[in-house]
Curated annotation (Swiss-Prot):
SUPFAM superfamilies: C-terminal domain of alpha and beta subunits of F1 ATP synthase, N-terminal domain of alpha and beta subunits of F1 ATP synthase, P-loop containing nucleoside triphosphate hydrolases
Protein name as it appears in the record: ATP synthase subunit beta
MF annotations from Gene Ontology: ATP binding; ATP hydrolysis activity; proton-transporting ATP synthase activity, rotational mechanism
Predominant place of localization: membrane
PANTHER family reported for this sequence: ATP SYNTHASE, ATP SYNTHASE SUBUNIT BETA, MITOCHONDRIAL
UniProt xrefs under PROSITE patterns: ATPASE_ALPHA_BETA
Family membership noted in the UniProt record: Belongs to the ATPase alpha/beta chains family.
Keyword list, A-Z: ATP synthesis, ATP-binding, Cell inner membrane, Cell membrane, CF(1), Hydrogen ion transport, Ion transport, Membrane, Nucleotide-binding, Translocase, Transport
HAMAP family the UniProt entry points to: ATP_synth_beta_bact (MF_01347)
Catalytic activity of the protein: ATP + H2O + 4 H(+)(in) = ADP + phosphate + 5 H(+)(out)
Positions bound to ATP: G150, G151, A152, G153, V154, G155, K156, T157
Organism: Proteus mirabilis (strain HI4320)
Location relative to the cell: Cell inner membrane
Length: 460
């Protein structure tokens, strides 16, 4: 193992000098004793003359020139396998939950090759989430990739927590959760939510919060992914949750600027598409096992054409778009049924009935959207009888797309609901066919199945 010394520290960027014959390779991990703490650096560039430029994985407070640096001779390696379940780890795979060491011999490098073309598998099996609007409009594929797009405060994290809870309880598989640059409070809420629903022993948690340096936030997604890859290569169907992909991009932007690269559009890093590809190409299913991933994507200023969300779109099978307009109506989950799409919404995959009901729901909502202008100017009375019926059904459908969540019970006071796909299709088909035209629209708000709406109507 080669030893060098620190020659320059600028925030999270540290330059170290090594003997000319033993310069560390790019992506090698280096270790510095900073007081009593060990700090890990990752080599990003070789500057020549034995000097390497590194990004710190922790705070560089207290570092000084001349400190001894050791080359570990390999990239950052993290523990993998069943020992990681139920534990909270940081970017280096070190436990941060005060429950002692992680007992495992096996450690994998966080930089790995994506599976080759021959190894990839293509499955058309659906993953039932129990959330009506998602199962109907943008069904998820087992081994597929889903993006939850939304601006600030429209419910990305709550939707993700509900998905994890439902899938962990109903499907009893393993999950890995990577918290990338999110709030520590959310990580804490999440941990307690998993403990309360008794699914903590099926989830590995990897956190790199907002207050961590950019190098940490850029690599923490890879740490979580590596743990998921291990479960996949053991032949399991694993779920990978990433909250938030935008912060991964943002950390890349910060690192890129610190390393002195020229920025590209909107100030993002010039390597935006490549960095996203490196992560996304590894999140895939092979003939051995599958990784189904759900990724929250923050949309800056609610602009879906921003380079960061736009780059993410290209990699996904299903996009769930959360809308501020729908949230302001008090309809949660605030999924926009006209903007959300899925590759699986195809009669050959979901069946003709599901496809027809989903498209029927979308077309009636689209017609309602068009009639809104007329209603705003002339009022409801000026509409034809046919259009009045469309509006009445559309408003019922809009309310029936809402649903009480298990993870939001604390806030709403109403118990959560898991609705099977069969019940979802039956309910919406009934509304489209006019079977429930006699019920008031309030009856459809925040209920599970259509039977609950009928019961609620009796009490109104």
């Amino acid at each position: 193992m080669a030893t060098g010394k620190i020659v320059q520290v600028i925030g999270a960027v540290v330059d170290a000098e090594f003997p000319q014959d033993s310069v560390p390779k790019v992506y090698d991990a280096l270790e510095v004793m900073n007081g009593k703490e060990k700090l890990v650096l990752e080599v990003q560039q070789q500057l020549g003359g034995g000097i390497v430029r590194c990004i710190a994985m922790g705070t560089s407070d207290g570092l000084s020139r001349g400190l001894k640096v050791e080359d570990l001779g390999h990239p950052i390696e993290v523990p993998v396998g069943k020992a990681t379940l139920g534990r909270i780890m940081n970017v280096l795979g070190t436990p941060i939950d005060m429950k002692g060491e992680i007992e495992t011999e096996e450690r994998w490098s966080i930089h790995r090759e994506a599976p080759t073309y021959e190894e990839l598998s293509n499955s058309q099996e659906l993953l039932e989430t129990g959330i009506k609007v998602m199962d109907l409009i943008c069904p998820f594929a087992k081994g597929g990739k889903v993006g939850l797009f939304g601006g600030a405060g429209v419910g990305k994290t709550v939707n993700m927590m509900e998905l994890i809870r439902n899938i962990a309880i109903e499907h009893s598989g393993y999950s890995v959760f990577a918290g990338v640059g999110e709030r520590t409070r959310e990580g804490n809420d999440f941990y307690h939510e998993m403990t309360d629903s008794n699914v903590l022993d099926k989830v590995s948690l990897v956190y790199g919060q907002m207050n961590e340096p950019p190098g940490n936030r850029l690599r923490v997604a890879l740490t979580g992914l590596t743990m998921a890859e291990k479960f996949r290569d053991e032949g399991r169907d694993v779920l990978l949750f990433v909250d938030n992909i935008y912060r991964y991009t943002l950390a890349g932007t910060e690192v890129s600027a610190l390393l002195g690269r020229m920025p590209s559009a909107v100030g993002y890093q010039p390597t935006l598409a490549e960095e996203m590809g490196v992560l996304q190409e590894r999140i895939t299913s092979t003939k051995t096992g599958s990784i189904t991933s759900v990724q929250a994507v923050y949309v800056p200023a609610d602009d879906l054409t921003d380079p960061s969300p736009a780059t993410t779109f290209a990699h996904l099978d299903a996009t769930v778009v959360l809308s501020r307009q729908i949230a302001s109506l008090g309809i949660y989950p605030a999924v926009d049924p006209l903007d959300s799409t899925s590759r699986q919404l195809d009669p050959l995959v979901v069946g003709q009935e599901h496809y027809d009901v989903a498209r029927g729901v979308q077309s009636i909502l689209q017609r309602y959207q068009e009639l809104k202008d007329i209603i705003a100017i002339l009022g409801m009375d000026e509409l034809s009888e046919e259009d009045k019926l469309v509006v009445a059904r559309a408003r019922k459908i809009q309310r029936f797309l809402s649903q009480p969540f298990f993870v939001a019970e604390v806030f709403t006071g109403s118990p959560g609901k898991f609705v099977s796909l069969k019940d979802t299709i039956r309910g919406f088909k009934g509304i489209l066919n006019g079977d429930y035209d006699h019920l008031p629209e309030q009856a459809f708000y925040m209920v599970g199945t259509i039977e609950e709406a009928v019961e609620k109507a009796k009490k109104l």
